[in-house]
């Protein structure tokens, strides 16, 4: 804001969609409050890019009529997701920044009724040449994840994950 007020051109480059867990809305509010003209160039959010690159549809006529994007952590540490609603069938759940709370996410979903056999995947370094997909069942997710290291990852949970080539490659191991 300070640089723009001094007449300089300012670019805020954000990977993905700046309005999906990117704080774009907060930044726009600050610019509007300061009376600074701006332009937002939309990007492709990680959920869309990573799922497509991994061969995981977010929706499917027979498997998931909806998808929901969630932060793995909430701004207020005392806040919580509606786990009962998230455990309902027929949806794909995509958690951004959720790997540090992977155990809690898996436990809460299963405790609220999501089947332990539900397909789940972590897409590491999505859409990059180094992309890796770890696909398994929800009940095995926590045990299998540590072997993949502390890279950035997007967590996808739902029946559409079974369509991923990575899930299909080892269905008995999944």
Regions inferred by a protein language model and the residue ranges of each:
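Short glycine-cluster motifs
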Residues: 2-73
